[in-house]
Amino acid sequence: IAMTLVILAGTAIALFGVLGPAFDLPMRGSLVLFFLITALYVFTTAGLGLLAATVARNLAQVGMLTVVILMPMLLLSGAWTPIEAMPDWMRILAWISPLHYFLDAAYGILLKGTGMDLLWDSVLAMGLLGVLVFGAGMGRFGRQFG
């Protein structure tokens, strides 16, 4: 919980200290909703980290697994290349990237002022991914150390 609060504080500093003043970013949506969805994304990525840590045998392997997990997740998120411009097989892979759903929700909230009535599918998908990966990580952790 403490690390989640640190990440949320860093997000707030970046949002209000950098993006707002430097780029004159118009924040149109609910900041409470944005931070709740950010906390859900942190939960999902913590699950990925826990799962990677239980698969690896040492810290060096965790570092390598992090690159192997994060690079495709970033490339398939839609941040650099729109999902619509990707081939069909890459679009399917983008569905398993929690970053794709987080960016969809964050853009919707901050730039468009969208509410949960239009973002529920992205939030639900990210939540399901979070429960799956965190559950898998906890299961592996329990078998290894329990």
In which residue ranges do the predicted regions lie?
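Alpha-helical transmembrane segments and their short interhelical loops
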Residues: 1-67, 71, 116-123, 127, ...
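Membrane-interfacial helix-loop-helix junctions in multi-pass membrane proteins
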Residues: 26, 78-132
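Short cytosolic juxtamembrane segments of multi-pass membrane proteins
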Residues: 139-146
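A cross-family signal for key residues in well-ordered alpha-helices
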Residues: 66, 94, 142
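Conserved catalytic core of Hanks-type protein kinase domains
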Residues: 68, 75, 96
